[in-house]
Structures are given as C-alpha cells and as structure tokens.
C-alpha cells in the first residue's frame, strides 16, 4: 500500500467519525443535545451512583479538558448533570447524571443505535469482528506515538 493510500485510509476514518457524529446530532437536535453531549451523558448514566471524574471522561473519549469543561457546563445548565466535591479533595468534583438525563437515556440510546445500525448495515458478524480487531491494532500502534508526542510537548 502506498503512502497516498495510507493517508486516504486515515482521511476516510476521520470522515466516517465526523459524518456519524453529524447524523447522530441531527437526530438529537429536537432535544437540543449534540452527539458528543449524548455520549458523555450515557457514559455518566452507565457509571451510575458512584459518579465520574472529568479526567475519566477525558481518558474515555480523548477530548481536551477545556473542551470537556465547556460541555459539562452546558449540560449542567440544561439540568442533565450535577457535580459534587470529592470526599477528601475539594479540588476534584464527581459528576453525576440527573433524573432528567435518565429520562432521556432510552431516546439517546435509540438515536445512536439507529445510526450505528445503518452504518454497519450489510456487514457480516465476521467482518465486524475483523474491523474491530484491526481498529484495536491501530489504537495499540497509536498509543506509543501519543506518549512520545506528549513527552516532546512537555519538554518545550
């Protein structure tokens, strides 16, 4: 495979992610929630009563901390998230989904699931397993590269 074709593969991956996110956001627009906000809410809902730190969301999704702070602020303003200080460390806050968010959960899951089903339509279970395996391999290859660039950034 040529370098040009490798670049196309990455562009196509990016395009798939962007378009999928836009499709989900359009479905959720009547609820005034974006795809990213929906994924954050579902993450909080799935973590239930123990709460979640902003850094946990950062690790799970890879969004920058400032971006996440803005998203969490908007979701708090809409009444979907509440924050409590951590016991023993007032600087850290645990985030919880509210009952209002819990009521949205079925529709969030339905909207995201509908887009995913359309995206994977026509794939056999074996093809999906292969795709998953290859994506995991890409992520494993990316991990050391990310650590290298983070070290370089911290030096400057």
Positions of predicted regions on the chain:
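N-terminal helix-turn-helix DNA-binding core of bacterial DNA-binding proteins
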Residues: 22-64
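N-terminal leader segment of winged-helix/HTH proteins
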Residues: 1-31, 78
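Charged, amphipathic alpha-helical coiled-coil/dimerization segments
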Residues: 73-133
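Alpha-helical linker/hinge and terminal dimerization helices associated
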Residues: 16, 20, 61, 104-120, ...
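C-terminal regulatory/oligomerization modules of transcriptional regulators
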Residues: 1-5, 125-156
């Amino acid at each position: 495979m040529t370098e040009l074709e490798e670049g196309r593969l990455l562009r196509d991956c990016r395009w798939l992610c962007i378009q999928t996110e836009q499709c989900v956001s359009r479905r959720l627009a009547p609820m005034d929630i974006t795809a990213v906000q929906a994924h954050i809410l579902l993450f909080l809902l799935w973590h239930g009563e123990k709460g979640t730190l902003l850094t946990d969301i950062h690790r799970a999704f890879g969004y920058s901390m400032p971006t996440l702070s803005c998203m969490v602020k908007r979701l708090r303003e809409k009444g979907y998230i509440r924050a409590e200080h951590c016991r023993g460390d007032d600087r850290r806050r645990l985030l919880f989904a509210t009952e209002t968010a819990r009521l949205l959960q079925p529709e969030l899951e339905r909207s995201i699931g509908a887009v995913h089903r359309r995206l994977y339509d026509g794939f056999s279970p074996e093809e999906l397993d292969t795709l998953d395996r290859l994506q995991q391999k890409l992520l494993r290859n990316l991990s050391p590269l990310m650590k290298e660039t983070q070290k370089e950034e911290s030096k400057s």
